[in-house]
């Protein structure tokens, strides 16, 4: 193994969506360095922070029918019943909603909570309230998708926050997606809601920290637990 390969493997991968922002931060740092070493170092720190924000580390995802994994890194902010956004055409009645709040220090690449087919994809412009507020689910800019599985339909909604002003989606309607696969990204702080059938067994609690693609949120299966496989992505 070459030295270059060793160094490359030791570095945290950066998602391509971050390249323009990192480049801008580097240019600013170089410009500040011309006027002041102190200001230049602040610029370098900003560039490093920007790169870390767009980091995209590999994850080891548990793979078993019925398991629902966290779509985002962050903190469980709410677990309860709520009506899903109308544009998803998911249900007119309240469903189980698990909300994950992401701060600006979390990884912001979002991963599919289940394996299935993307039945619907819907973007809705809106406000930029604090994503930790309950009404952010209704009023903020959001991008939602419905994933159809053999057991049920699962709704996933990316919600913009105070700082986040751009939701990025990597998928299209009709495509198949595997649990733990990347489906989108929200820039600079936000929230992700997962909508599930009422009665789903929840395995997390409010305040708990989550890791996208790894933390198991719920179990949709009523069967006895079977052997769980794991996949790195």
From Swiss-Prot:
GO cellular component annotations of the record: plasma membrane
Modification sites for Pyruvic acid (Ser): 190
Essential cofactor(s): pyruvate
Cleaved signal peptide residues: none
GO biological process: phosphatidylethanolamine biosynthetic process
A GO term for molecular function: phosphatidylserine decarboxylase activity
Pathway: Phospholipid metabolism; phosphatidylethanolamine biosynthesis; phosphatidylethanolamine from CDP-diacylglycerol: step 2/2
Pfam families, per database record: PS_Dcarbxylase
Name of the protein in its database record: Phosphatidylserine decarboxylase proenzyme
Source taxonomy: Bacteria, Pseudomonadati, Pseudomonadota, Alphaproteobacteria, Hyphomicrobiales
